Amino acid sequence: DRNTSGIVIAGKNSEALRQINEAVKLKSIKKYYKTLVCGKIEKSGRLEDFYEKDSQLNKAKVGGKEGKIITTIYRPLKTNGRYTLAEVELITGKSHQIRVHMASAGFPIIGDVKYGNKQENEYFRKKAGVKRQMLHAYKMVFEGLKGELAYLNGKTVTADVPKDFKCAEKEIFGI
């Protein structure tokens, strides 16, 4: 998603891109995100739902009876009872997946204008200058890669959260 910060993976040429796409499909590249959400997440969970996307409205929905199955795993890292810093692992990778899945589970992402809570977003805009969703691709783990990408096996790439994320985190947890 355009307003998500963090690691972006790209291929230098069409063959490298094909191999990356194949590796993602085979789960040889694992993607992890940090997010700040409304609500108290007490324990780890796994979300699995049918996913549909309306391309004209550029909006996704989950929980119907048809579409593609998507899977998202989440783990609470820290909570104050009202908000939670969570790690999210993408098992499937659809557009808006984390945002729509977390919102449907009752944990909308702070700053998400499409699936989030308007009042909470306004509060964080005023108090911490939040102008985008607090979703950050912070880690990629490479394992089981073949061919030209095999040199990445066993490697982990990480990216620190940006300043706006830290400001929102400070507002919540006083860090």
For each predicted feature, which ranges?
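Residues embedded in well-ordered beta-strands
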Residues: 34-36, 139
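Glycine/acidic-rich beta-strand-loop module
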Residues: 1-26
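Polynucleotide-recognition surfaces of large bacterial nucleic-acid defense/processing enzymes
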Residues: 89
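Glycine- and acidic-residue-rich catalytic/RNA-contacting loop of pseudouridine synthases
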Residues: 17-22, 36-85, 100, 144, ...
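Short, well-structured beta-strand segments within conserved domains
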Residues: 96-98
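Pseudouridine synthases involved in rRNA/tRNA modification
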Residues: 101-175
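A generic structural signal for well-ordered coil/turn residues at beta-strand boundaries
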Residues: 4, 31, 47, 70-73, ...
